[in-house]
Amino acid sequence: MARINVVVSFLAALAVVQAAQLLNLDGQKDAVPGSYVVVMNDGLSGLDFESHVKSMAKVQKANALKRDFDNTADGVKFKYNINGWQAYSGKFDNKTIQSILDDPRVNYIEPQRTFRAFGWVTQDNAPSWGLGRISHTSRGRMDYVYDSSAGENVTVYSVDSGVDISHPEFEGRAIWGVNAADNSDVDQIGHGTHTSGTIAGKTYGVAKMAKIVAVKVLDAGGQGTNGGIIQGINWAVNHARQNNVTGKAVMNMSFGGGLSRAINEAASSAVRAGIFMVAAAGNNNEDARYTTPASARGVCAVGASTQNDLKARFSNWGPTLAVYAPGDRIWSAMPDGGRDVMRGTSMAAPHVAGVAAVLISSEKIGTDRLCERIKELSVSSIQSPGADTTDKLLYNGSGQ
């Protein structure tokens, strides 16, 4: 009898250890009430995943009936499979969340929070200097020198607020991909058009022959959620596979927020799928290890520098940064054929995405080696980079 009790106690303890975890946010100010991302255990079959989702949909429906058809919690919105990483997101009531937690197929549940664009401050009549800086080892030059391949046959996914794909800057090389933010398939704030112009615009772009695919995850307020962002990443990975561009694809993420385990895991899964991931480090002058998606494993995190090779006062810093790039007073495209100047790590990241696209086309380098190659080429120029932070400034290796 004693042996049976020991076995029962062990199994009970094992069940506790294996129970799914409901993660807490580091502060609730960015929380989206009642919205969650549910992440499944590694190795779960597709059939088991679908079985779980259907089961929880029934639970949600039953709970809704008990609430007298209150639709404030409306169930699954997005399902994800990013290189084997499986999850889903939506709105669920507390009873449904408890049922999800009790399912042994679930790894953890993360409350949804908002993430924001990292480039907002504008200043009229500022000079455009970033292209000249990244193609010379010393500052002060305004000419842009680059390899003639110019990112040709490379696809860059602009995960942002959308892109004005008809803007003359893109010369027909930009297409609309997916909208995971709202019901408006346009760039309402200009942020995504600006960053994409830096990546691949004919005038302002680093990789002037690369293709842009608009993946909208930020709404008219410049905000998005865990679920929408992961949906954008999921869509981009599937699109890259369907179009045979894995290994020749870049994803730029000029946004961020507090730590999200789910987004970080989704981004890392995209890296393993053959997408080179670039992320803005953030604009809070703090350690980027506590910012998502810049802190994700395998993501190339970028801080912002000034025209004087200083760390921009707003830029995040820390050991997670791969490199600094121009991010202060950057001119680029805006919707309806316009142009404007912005500053932020949002403006720095697309310089790196553009250089990555050029390196893929010119050196035929694999996406798994790109961040290291970019760091190899970069020059030690940043003054006062921050504690435990690289002093490397982006350089495209032009020889100038």
Swiss-Prot record:
Q: Where in the cell is it found?
A: Secreted
Residues annotated as signal peptide? 1-19
Catalytic residue list: 160, 191, 346
Q: Where is the Peptidase S8 domain?
A: 128-400
**Which UniProt keywords are given for this protein, alphabetically ordered?**
Glycoprotein, Hydrolase, Protease, Secreted, Serine protease, Signal, Virulence, Zymogen
Tell me the Gene Ontology biological-process terms attached to this UniProt entry. Answer: proteolysis
The broad enzyme category this protein falls into is hydrolase
In its keyword annotation, does this UniProt entry include Cell wall biogenesis/degradation? no
Q: Which residues form the propeptide?
A: 20-118
The EC number(s) this enzyme carries: 3.4.21.-
Q: Which residues are glycosylated?
A: 153, 244, 252, 396
GO MF terms, alphabetically ordered: serine-type endopeptidase activity
Boundaries of every Inhibitor I9 domain copy: 35-116
Give Gene Ontology CC terms.
extracellular region
Extract the PANTHER family matched here. CEREVISIN-RELATED, PEPTIDASE S8
Q: Name the family the entry cites.
A: Belongs to the peptidase S8 family.
Q: State the function annotated in the UniProt record.
A: Secreted subtilisin-like serine protease with keratinolytic activity that contributes to pathogenicity.
Q: What is this protein called?
A: Subtilisin-like protease CPC735_047380
Source species of the chain: Coccidioides posadasii (strain C735) (Valley fever fungus)
Q: Give the source lineage, highest ranks first.
A: Eukaryota, Fungi, Dikarya, Ascomycota, Pezizomycotina
